[in-house]
Amino acid sequence: MKRTFQPSNRKRRNKHGFRLRMSTKNGRKILSARRAKGRHSLSVSSEMGTAGK
């Protein structure tokens, strides 16, 4: 039987990335909350840099 978590950087970026967060009102709310909290990384794509492309 296959395990449930099959990691893929593309899916990870598309589902939880910065662009997706910015595209909705609630997503922007998440980002501002993470900024206010002082999180090191705001979203998945911001921690990737150019290596994730």
Curated annotation (Swiss-Prot):
It holds the Pfam family Ribosomal_L34. GO terms for cellular component: ribonucleoprotein complex; ribosome. Keywords: Ribonucleoprotein, Ribosomal protein. Residues 1-53 are annotated as: Disordered. Residues 42-53 have a biased composition (Polar residues). One of its GO terms (molecular function) is structural constituent of ribosome. It comes from the Bacteria. This is Large ribosomal subunit protein bL34. It comes from Chlorobium luteolum (strain DSM 273 / BCRC 81028 / 2530) (Pelodictyon luteolum). The gene is rpmH.
